[in-house]
A protein has these predicted regions:
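Short hydrophobic beta-strand segments
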Residues: 14, 99-104, 151-153
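Short beta-strand->loop
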Residues: 170-185
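Extracellular/periplasmic catalytic domains that process cell-envelope and extracellular macromolecules
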Residues: 7-8, 32-34, 93-96, 115, ...
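Short, solvent-exposed loop/beta-turn-alpha elements that line the ligand-binding surface or hinge
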Residues: 1, 132, 180
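Alpha-helical, coiled-coil/dimerization segments enriched in small aliphatic residues
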Residues: 111-137
Length: 188
């Protein structure tokens, strides 16, 4: 949504990421507070120095439950999520952890979502061997060298309508055709 559309809605609460509330996007929290609108910024978007975790997401869900007076629904959702994780871990405990790559397409390189990211934490929590490097990006050559068993594509907020194009881009890269994830149709 753009600023004009949001202003026309006359919200009393806006929920978003840190990047949502800048002068280039939907303005700052001060802008909205002057219009009697509260702002909730997800903790996971604040650029924490520590790793982003599922526990932070559980906190986010609990916070929204409190804000909207839906505590029981929030706790039920968290419980379902935790049960799904426990089930997956139990079902895969006897298997070798798959080598998992979490990436976002950025030109000819990929932004890497490693252990300190929420995606990487989810992968590790679900019994995956998460591929990580010292740098925030990974080249196609490095993807070939790492040879992941599964690739998860991260599609950012403004690119949801392009998800199929992004998937097709990865699936049709000649240099990636020998990668296990592509050969075994495990790109998600």
């Amino acid at each position: 949504a753009n600023l004009e559309s949001v202003l026309m809605m006359k919200p009393d609460l806006l929920v978003g990421w840190k990047s949502t509330f800048t002068n280039k996007m939907l303005q700052t929290p001060t802008f909205w507070q002057a219009r009697q609108a509260n702002v909730y910024i997800a903790e996971s978007s604040l650029g924490a120095q520590s790793a982003l975790t599922m526990d932070m997401e559980y906190k986010y869900i609990r916070d929204l439950g409190r804000i909207f007076n839906r505590n029981m629904e929030a706790e039920r959702l968290i419980q379902e999520m935790q049960q799904s994780v426990a089930y997956t871990v139990a079902q895969t405990a006897h298997e070798k952890p798959p080598k998992a790559l979490f990436i976002e397409v950025q030109g000819k390189h990929f932004r890497l979502y490693g252990h300190k990211t929420l995606a990487g934490n989810i992968g590790a929590s679900l019994h995956a061997d998460v591929i990580d490097t010292e740098t925030p990006s990974i080249s196609m050559e490095d993807v070939v060298e790492q040879n992941p068993d599964v690739i998860f594509l991260i599609v950012s907020d403004g690119e949801y309508s392009q998800a199929d194009v992004i998937m097709n881009y990865v699936l049709t890269q000649p240099g990636l055709q020998g990668v296990n994830a592509l050969r075994n149709k495990r790109v998600h």
